[in-house]
């Protein structure tokens, strides 16, 4: 399938893109201000709790990104439409970045809270595996010269790697871990204050 974009469409996208970049940057700065500087310290953990405002969204986005990657791989297998390869290839580095941010901010928070930078906790280990899955997906695309072969092998990895997503999500329920249980559940109201959730 050949996707053709006219010059006027490209100019329109470039114009909209600059507005999106500026608005995203401003919203990001405002969000960081309110979450890291304006929010009150936790009554137990103090100021170290503020890093959760970066850690938790990064972890959620890393799981969401891999879910999009896996869905794109499945749809590519069914339709062989190259746009879905492009979706998966494009979101892999974004997901890897969010996973790395979640791992690093979790370690920064873990040092004063748990007393160590890293423990081989079920959720931590499965998040580290997710980071390696992202890296493997990216490296497969870059190391295999034949694009059709790279697409097939990468799609298989993307689909099989999705098994790790429910393991990450439910690891706190299945095993005795240092992480707290889920604060958002389908069966009950969230245990986190609604103002903090928003």
Regions found by a protein language model. Give the residues of each.
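Interfacial helix-start motif at the membrane-water boundary
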Residues: 52-66
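Membrane-interface transmembrane-helix boundary segments in multi-pass integral membrane proteins
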Residues: 56, 176-198
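N-terminal membrane topogenic signal
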Residues: 8-24
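Non-cytosolic membrane-interface motifs at loop->transmembrane helix junctions
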Residues: 46-53, 113-127, 150-154
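Membrane-interface helix-boundary motifs at transmembrane edges
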Residues: 13, 78-90, 144-150
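Membrane-interface helix-loop-helix modules in multi-pass inner-membrane proteins
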Residues: 94-139
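Alpha-helical transmembrane segments of multi-pass membrane proteins
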Residues: 25-43
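Hydrophobic alpha-helical membrane-insertion segments
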Residues: 154-170
């Amino acid at each position: 399938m050949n996707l053709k974009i006219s010059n006027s469409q490209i100019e329109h996208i470039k114009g909209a893109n600059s507005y999106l970049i500026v608005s995203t940057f401003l919203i990001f700065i405002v969000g960081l201000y309110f979450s890291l500087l304006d929010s009150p310290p936790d009554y137990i953990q103090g100021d170290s709790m503020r890093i959760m405002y970066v850690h938790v969204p990064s972890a959620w986005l890393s799981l969401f990104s891999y879910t999009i990657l896996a869905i794109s791989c499945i749809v590519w297998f069914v339709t062989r439409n190259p746009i879905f390869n492009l979706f998966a290839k494009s979101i892999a580095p974004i997901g890897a970045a969010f996973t790395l941010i979640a791992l690093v901010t979790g370690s920064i928070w873990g040092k004063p809270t748990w007393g160590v930078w890293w423990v081989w906790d079920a959720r931590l280990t499965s998040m580290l595996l997710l980071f390696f899955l992202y890296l493997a997906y990216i490296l497969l695309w870059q190391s295999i010269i034949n694009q059709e072969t790279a697409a097939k092998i990468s799609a298989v990895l993307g689909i099989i790697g999705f098994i790790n997503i429910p393991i990450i999500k439910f690891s706190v329920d299945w095993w005795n871990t240092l992480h707290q249980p889920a604060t958002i559940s389908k069966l009950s109201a969230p245990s986190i204050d609604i103002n903090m959730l928003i």
